[in-house]
Amino acid sequence: MAVAENVGVKVDSSNNQNIDNNTTSLVETKPSCSDDQTPKSKSSVLTNELIQRTSEVNLKSEISHLNPMAKEFVPSFLAQTHHSEFWGNRFWFTNHFPKQTIFLIGQFATMRRNFGKGRPWITKKTNLVQNEDMIKRTVYVSDIDNQVTEEQLASLFLSCGQVVDCRMCGDYKSILRFAFIEFTDAEGARSALRKSGTMFGSHPIRVFMSKTAIAPVNPSFLPQSKDELEKCGKTVYCTNIDKEVTKMELENFFKTVCGEVHHLRLLGDFYHQTRIAFVEFKLAESAISALNCSGVVLGELPIRVSPSKTPVRLHHSDLN
């Protein structure tokens, strides 16, 4: 914003005193010249002119530090170009007048005062837009039979559109569960609403437009190498395991029915009435066979088996 350069500027009287002293000394020490035609009666006029000029110079020097019309600083990587205000298809703000600003994600677009340093200026807004788009493509399915797997539920909705993700959730105290299903487009989600009331398993499901998007899987849980990716193809995720079933009993069951087990990790806590397990087989064919074991009763509860999204990562306790 352009402002009058002299508005609000104060010059200390001590500076004026210094100016007077310096100017007087300059006049007094001026060497005499034989060609000097200036009448001595005009010496006071000359002194006043020098004082005025010196004051103006110092005043302009003071104001230049605060002048919004001062010359714009140009980084060295921009100064090498012919036009410092335009570089790499980007326009930048200068102090002369505002120009169109085009900030590209991840490139010279960090927030001011280093808040959120290293992140794009528009990342938050972009994430909100992407999240809203995901919500429009997602449906919420309730009253799902607890024997139904994610794969079976996703297969039911394939006629509505391409399924991107299916996330099954539920309380261990309830015989029914719920799920979120994401499609590639909003049209698939709208078509899925027609499935509401369909008998699936032992209970009719209900389908609504979701108010939230499916939370992404923690990247640290996903395969981190080609070897772990291959292990996922041989691994199944088993849930609803009776707490009375031991690790040895579970391993013997899968070994007898499906094939040799390479690794098995059984997990549980005091808060849940059931446990979960990750079972890695020697062969991928054994893992495929294990999917057919979903619904088999071990102890007093039917287990649920689905393909694992993560490999088995053993702890020291699992090696004992």
Swiss-Prot record:
Disulfide bonds: none annotated. Residues 137-212, 234-310 form the RRM domain. PROSITE patterns: RRM (PS50102). It holds the Pfam family RRM_1. Residues 1-44 are annotated as: Disordered. Residues 12-44 have a biased composition (Polar residues). GO terms for molecular function: RNA binding. Keywords: Repeat, RNA-binding. InterPro entries: CID8-like_RRM1, CID8-like_RRM2, Nucleotide-bd_a/b_plait_sf, PAM2_motif, RBD_domain_sf, RRM_dom. The keyword Methyltransferase does not apply. It comes from the Eukaryota. A motif (PAM2-like) lies at residues 65-75. Contains a PAM2-like motif, which seems to be involved in the binding to the PABC/CTC domain of PAB proteins. PANTHER family: LD29830P (PTHR32343:SF22), SERINE/ARGININE-RICH SPLICING FACTOR (PTHR32343). This is Polyadenylate-binding protein-interacting protein 13.
